[in-house]
């Protein structure tokens, strides 16, 4: 096992963030959630903390290149049901909306110089579906968005949930991630 990366990472979300384009929705939410819908900085803070948490724990699934790289990049798109339905159909052959899609870009067989920025992939979240789920679970939209983005991130890092037990483990770790920067979410 190699030495784990302990220096801060430079997570590039500024150029890869695609905000929600729903003025009607952003007028109905609190200031923090509105900021999450329109700005990369809250996501950069959360994602950096979450990735650092995963990188520090050698028992957690995380590609070696992610543990060692000082610079990481990923895309985050907040979209609507129509767009995520199109993506779900194109990539998963499912003609239905979903809450979050992840498109991992990592190739674990690559050997890159340690100063290379590693592209993790893209996370796409349907804000409309997140809003319905937040209402269903009786919590704020901002919390549901954080839940979905943390789920997408774990998929980019190689996590999956083909069994009930693996899903339970993944959801439990998501709760730990959300507690790093604030409110815990119980799904």
UniProtKB/Swiss-Prot annotation:
It is found in: Cytoplasm. One of its GO terms (biological process) is rRNA processing. Pfam families: YbeY. Zn(2+) binds at residues 151, 155, 161. The keyword Metal-binding applies. Signal peptide: none annotated. Transmembrane segments: none annotated. This is Endoribonuclease YbeY. It comes from Prochlorococcus marinus (strain MIT 9313). The gene is ybeY.
């Amino acid at each position: 096992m190699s030495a784990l990366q302990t220096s801060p990472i430079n997570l590039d979300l500024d150029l890869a963030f695609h905000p929600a384009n729903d003025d009607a929705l952003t007028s109905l939410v609190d200031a923090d959630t509105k900021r999450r819908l329109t700005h990369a900085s809250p996501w950069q803070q959360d994602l950096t903390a979450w990735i650092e948490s995963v990188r520090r724990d050698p028992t957690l699934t995380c590609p070696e290149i992610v543990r060692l790289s000082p610079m990481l990049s990923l895309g985050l798109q907040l979209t609507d049901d129509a767009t995520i339905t199109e993506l779900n159909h194109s990539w998963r052959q499912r003609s239905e909306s979903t809450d979050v899609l992840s498109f991992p870009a990592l190739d674990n067989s690559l050997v890159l110089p340690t100063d290379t920025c590693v592209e993790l992939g893209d996370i796409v979240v349907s804000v409309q579906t997140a809003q319905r789920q937040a209402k269903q679970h009786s919590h704020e939209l901002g919390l549901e968005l954080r839940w979905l983005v943390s789920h997408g991130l774990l998929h980019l890092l190689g996590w999956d949930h083909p069994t009930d037990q693996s899903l339970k483990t993944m959801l439990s770790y998501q709760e730990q991630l959300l507690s790093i920067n604030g409110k815990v979410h119980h799904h």
